[in-house]
Amino acid sequence: MNKSILTFAFLASSASLISMGAAAETTISGNISSKCSVFTDTVGVYGNPSPDELSTLVADGGIQPIIRYDVSIADYYTAKISWPNSFTTSPNLTDALNWDGEIEVHNTSDAGMSGYEAAKVEYENVTEYDLSVAGSTWFKVTSEVTYGVDKSLPGGEYKASVEALCIAN
């Protein structure tokens, strides 16, 4: 009889566990490394070819910034580069600034990238390139700014930033 009671008690507790059910929450995680990296290869410097102008062109005494994109998988990324349209640092300026600029392919690691320049998309101060070939591409940036109408820029430090993004398609 004790054996029957023990067996019944065991079966009842097992049935109770089965009817209650069990639940678990399992986490799935992962880390993704970007297959597109952006680097500054050459820092830009403004030349001052005339009292009212700053320019990164070599002919104007400047140094054009060079931005490098390294892409390990083709057709998944877009380079989005903006030439400056404001100063991040400057003396107090009381007149209008007129900005102009250009982004161009400077060098490539693969001959298949030769069509990048012809296929670029430009709007406002932004240039986009479809990075359709794996490898490295160097872009040079031209930045020019004039101050007022025949008005001299005040002495002091001037800085502007190029924004270079790698956008996943």
For each feature predicted by the language model, list its residue ranges.
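Extended, solvent-exposed segments with strong compositional bias
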Residues: G112-A134
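Low-complexity "stalk/linker" and mucin-like segments enriched in Ser/Thr/Pro/Ala/Gly
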Residues: L93-D100, Y116-V121
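N-terminal small/polar-rich segments of proteins
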Residues: A22-A96, E128-N169
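N-terminal signal peptide c-region/cleavage motif recognized by signal peptidases
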Residues: S14, I18-G21
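Bacterial N-terminal signal peptides that target proteins for export
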Residues: M1-F8
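Short, surface-exposed beta-strand/strand-loop-strand elements in extracellular ectodomains
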Residues: L97-S109
